[in-house]
Amino acid sequence: MTRLTRTGVAAIALVAATMCSIAGAPHVAAAACDGTYTIVVGGFGDGASTIFSGGVDQRVGYSAQLSSASVREGVNELNRLVRDQRQACPSQHAKVIGYSEGAAVAHIWVSENWATFDDVNAVLISDPKRQGGPGTDGLAGQFYAAVMGAPLYGADRNFGDIPTVSICTDDVICDSAAPSGWIGYLTGAHGNYSFDVDDYSDDGDGQWFNGVFMPW
């Protein structure tokens, strides 16, 4: 085989390989849109949302400070990320999970976006914006939290038609009159939850309060 012929064969092989890569690209993109897109928001001091384990697809990054400005930052970043993913994968279900201050971020996002976003569910773990009944409002719903201002201040259930699960277990953050009180908080009650995202379904709706499930 002459040098010219060898060069021609190599060029043809390179073109063929390139065409195969191009042809295979849509399949790879489709695979990335399979299943559920799980996005998580960590609590106070966990700006990288590292507390969660399991099949996490995206961790929201924000300042995670105890202020409404920080919560608004988290809501805006969550909104950007989840909408970017929806644009890339229009038919993919999204699951938003937040813990503590991150639960407030997820709570507010649902309240502000339920009318314009579907095929999504939310899991709120120790949500300070949890509205009482059973139990009492979370810390954000107490009168002294008014100094925080919007959007952190207040407690509600404005979830529209988005399936939302709230989980609160003897924890003053989500039930300000929890029996364990602040001593319980200091001894670990606030962390007595599962942070494996695979433990939470894609369609749960209602609340787990002190280990008992109740519908909204």
List where the protein language model places each region.
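Amphipathic, positively biased hydrophobic alpha-helical segments used for protein targeting
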Residues: 24, 53-54, 109, 113
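Secretory targeting and sorting signals
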Residues: 1-30
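Residue-identity detector for threonine
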Residues: 2-7, 18, 36-38, 50, ...
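Serine-dependent carboxylesterase/thioesterase catalytic core
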Residues: 76-166
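Hydrophobic alpha-helical membrane segments, chiefly transmembrane helices and signal peptide h-regions
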Residues: 13-22, 99, 193-196, 200-204
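Active-site catalytic motif of lipid deacylating hydrolases and related acyltransferases
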Residues: 29-93, 130, 166-216
